[in-house]
Amino acid sequence: KSVIKVAAAMGEGPMLRDHELYALLRTTVQAADDKAAIVLGLGYKDTKGIIDDAKRAQDLGAIGLQVVPPIFNLPKQNEILQFYSDLSDAIDIGVMVYVTKGMHTPIYMDTYRKMADLENIVAIKWGAVVGEYEDIYELADTFNIIDNGHGAVDCHKLGGKGYINHTVDIHPPHDLRVWELCKNKQYEEAQALLDSVNGPLDKVYEKVGARTGGQSVVKKGLTAAMGRPCGPSRPPTGNMNEEEMDLLREVLTGCGWPVPSSN
């Protein structure tokens, strides 16, 4: 019902050295023991670099990849298409295309349409960087559309297959219930459940984000609050302070989650 995505931005993937990245992937695949699907986050390198990384990930047991365009090459649309075409031809596992605001490398709908001819491009992680949120769902019968913007309910209504979230690995019953409600078309209940957690958590993100950047800061706070700390952020990104952690524990407790005592 869920996928373990390793070394994407929330997992500090862009900050990992190559040997760390593949040690992490190897450990995750071994720990999963064929009980979960493992997807690795890759990006930013040129075509040759990405293909080398993708082949290694495939050999280590990843069943798919999340891949962003080579943003530092400032590629044009035809070059983005060629990048994914070359990658698709070089591997035998699935690729989820991903681009977000802030990368300054948008992918336009016509380029997504042309990707339909690429055998191993199987999913699009969608946050409507350009155009309207609904646009991508014209391709819902071609690709697995994965929401990347708190739009799980709308995604399901429009034919999407899943959503990115910050919480399924923190307290799985919450997001599994959200998606179950969506599949049963109990959309109002699903949205209310999402909002009951995302609303309070967004306030924590806002408070922490005013002091330090980085996508992993609150994520690491969440794991620590639930009794599974996974280490500090990588510099120069900071960590949650005690006041922020107290607020986070209060929020999670208010959501009814089993937060262990901090004493």
Briefly describe each language-model feature range.
Residues K1, H171-N263:
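C-terminal alpha-helical cap/extension of soluble enzyme domains
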Residues K1-H104, T237-G238:
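Active-site beta->alpha loop and helix N-cap motifs at the rims of alpha/beta catalytic domains
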Residues T28, A57, L87, I124, ...:
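Conserved, mostly hydrophobic/aromatic
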Residues K101-V204, V208:
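Catalytic alpha/beta core domains of metabolic enzymes, predominantly
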Residues L21, L25, I50, Y133, ...:
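A general structural signal for well-ordered alpha-helical segments in protein cores
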Residues Q58-G64, A90-I93, K114-A123, C230-G231:
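Structural recognition of alpha->loop->beta junctions
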